[in-house]
């Protein structure tokens, strides 16, 4: 409410100027703020936004450096890494360009869609990118989202998580990365528009359109449904990078059907396509395949960069076990080392673990659960016994024998280091 000049003399709660010394006084609950203080606050916020952006853009590594860091954590997926590195680099350079005020050419935001089987590294790629760039990052599960007004999470809750990740620093949050997982689960139930309401499928896609494209969203800082009377935080999503990921189970059949359409009746061609693995089929992905799968054209349009990830083979899984900086075997060996113990996993055991993960079709995600099951009893015992070497062989992985435990003779001056088995050539 605006306080007019004929009212009783009032002062600004911030600068203490009287009402006749300023143009306007805006009243709040027991406080007042003048137009000059409002202008000053606006200038301060603009300056803070510039500083926050400069901190991010000044430290952006080149695409080759981004790819190099990704190689330390993610095995394989070279083409996907290259596409992501270029896309992220261009995104943050775009922010620098927009902030400079040079708007002779309008640069649009390029969100990313990752398509690949379970455990192929989609989530890890997004997490590692955020770590490299040192920007706020949050993950959301698309399966929990519903259209506003229905049981489930509103899409604004995704923005709330980003605000929390940035410690409610709005300027930082507006330059963050949001990863939406399982986006294939919000595909509409049929290719044709439905006359009934699809609140967890097409309805969620429609709700995501605005925030993905760029809008000033009203975010409830305490969650939207339980506290309807709260004040909202205004968050501009124009510069937030959205990365969506999903396995898109069954899309290979859609692609194969399209590519074989012109050769119906020629069984030889169909049989040749059947011999292709999913990774090869996905390389032929077209926009029309995503539409047929159940994504609406408007939603696909908000994700101009689409990249597919390869299915991991046995060699890749063995590498994942031992080579990255945060390799699973290295993590378990460090855990044993903290108990003054040693963990040794031989080559044949690594191969068998990889084969089991392949058989379960869980990709890299299944490796940890297999190792956790194998090492549970050993971790239970070694904390009491200490100074033990635990050896895992192929027979142990296959459940034929128990993990081999032998006593270690170790001293503080000659402490044995964890051993990682060599990967067969």
Swiss-Prot record:
Q: Where does Zn(2+) bind?
A: 12, 15, 34, 37
Q: How does it assemble?
A: Component of the ClpX-ClpP complex. Forms a hexameric ring that, in the presence of ATP, binds to fourteen ClpP subunits assembled into a disk-like structure with a central cavity, resembling the structure of eukaryotic proteasomes.
GO cellular component assignments? HslUV protease complex
Q: Name one GO biological process term.
A: cell division
Positions annotated to bind ATP: 117-124
Residues in domain ClpX-type ZB? 1-53
Report keywords, A-Z. ATP-binding, Chaperone, Metal-binding, Nucleotide-binding, Zinc
Q: Which organism is it from?
A: Rickettsia peacockii (strain Rustic)
Report which superkingdom the organism of origin falls in: Bacteria
- This chain belongs to the protein called ATP-dependent Clp protease ATP-binding subunit ClpX
The entry's family comment says:
Belongs to the ClpX chaperone family.
- Any idea which GO molecular function terms this record carries? ATP binding; ATP hydrolysis activity; ATP-dependent protein folding chaperone; protein dimerization activity; unfolded protein binding; zinc ion binding
Q: Which InterPro entries did the record assign?
A: AAA+_ATPase (IPR003593), ATP-dep_Clp_protease_ClpX (IPR050052), ATPase_AAA_core (IPR003959), Clp_ATPase_C (IPR019489), Clp_protease_ATP-bd_su_ClpX (IPR004487), ClpX_bact (IPR046425), P-loop_NTPase (IPR027417), Znf_CppX_C4 (IPR010603)
Q: What does this protein do?
A: ATP-dependent specificity component of the Clp protease. It directs the protease to specific substrates. Can perform chaperone functions in the absence of ClpP.
Question: Does the entry feature the keyword Chaperone, yes or no?
Answer: yes
């Amino acid at each position: 409410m605006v306080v007019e000049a004929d009212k009783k003399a009032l002062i600004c709660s911030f600068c203490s100027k009287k009402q006749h010394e300023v143009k306007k006084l805006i009243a709040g609950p027991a406080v007042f703020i003048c137009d000059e203080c409002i202008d000053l606050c606006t200038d301060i916020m603009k300056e803070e936004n510039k500083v926050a952006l400069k901190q991010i853009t000044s430290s952006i590594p080149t695409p080759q450096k981004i790819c190099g860091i990704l190689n330390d954590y993610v095995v394989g997926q070279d083409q996907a890494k290259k596409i992501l590195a270029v896309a992220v680099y261009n995104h943050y350079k775009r922010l620098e360009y927009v902030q400079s005020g040079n708007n002779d050419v309008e640069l649009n935001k390029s969100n990313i869609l990752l398509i690949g089987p379970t455990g192929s590294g989609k989530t890890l790629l997004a997490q590692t990118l955020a770590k490299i760039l040192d920007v706020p990052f949050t993950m959301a599960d698309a399966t929990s989202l519903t259209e506003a007004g229905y049981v489930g999470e509103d899409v604004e809750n995704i923005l709330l998580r980003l605000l929390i990740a940035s410690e409610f620093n709005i300027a930082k949050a507006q330059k963050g990365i949001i990863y939406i997982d399982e986006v294939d689960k919000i595909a509409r139930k049929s290719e044709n528009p439905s006359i009934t309401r699809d609140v967890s499928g097409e309805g969620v896609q429609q709700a995501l359109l605005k925030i993905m494209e760029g809008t000033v969203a009203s975010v409830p800082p305490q969650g939207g449904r339980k506290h309807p009377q709260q004040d909202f935080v205004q968050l501009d999503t124009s510069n937030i990078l959205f990365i969506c990921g999903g396995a898109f189970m069954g899309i290979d059949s859609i692609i194969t059907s399209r590519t074989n359409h012109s050769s119906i009746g020629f069984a030889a061609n169909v049989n040749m396509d059947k011999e292709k693995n999913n990774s090869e089929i996905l390389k032929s992905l077209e926009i029309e395949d995503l539409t047929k799968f159940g994504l609406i054209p408007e939603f696909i349009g908000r994700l101009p960069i689409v990249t597919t990830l390869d299915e991991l083979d046995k060699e890749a899984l063995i590498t994942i076990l031992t080579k990255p900086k945060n390799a699973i075997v290295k993590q378990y060996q460090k855990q044993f080392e903290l108990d003054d113990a040693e963990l040794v996993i031989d080559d044949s055991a690594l191969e068998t673990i990889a084969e089991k993960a392949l058989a379960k079709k869980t990709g890299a995600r299944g490796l940890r659960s297999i190792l956790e099951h194998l090492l549970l009893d050993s971790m239970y015992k070694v904390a009491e016994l200490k100074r033990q070497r635990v050896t895992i062989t192929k027979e142990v992985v296959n459940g034929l024998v128990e993990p081999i435990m032998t006593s270690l003779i170790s001293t503080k001056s000659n402490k044995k280091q964890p051993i990682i088995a060599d990967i067969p050539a």
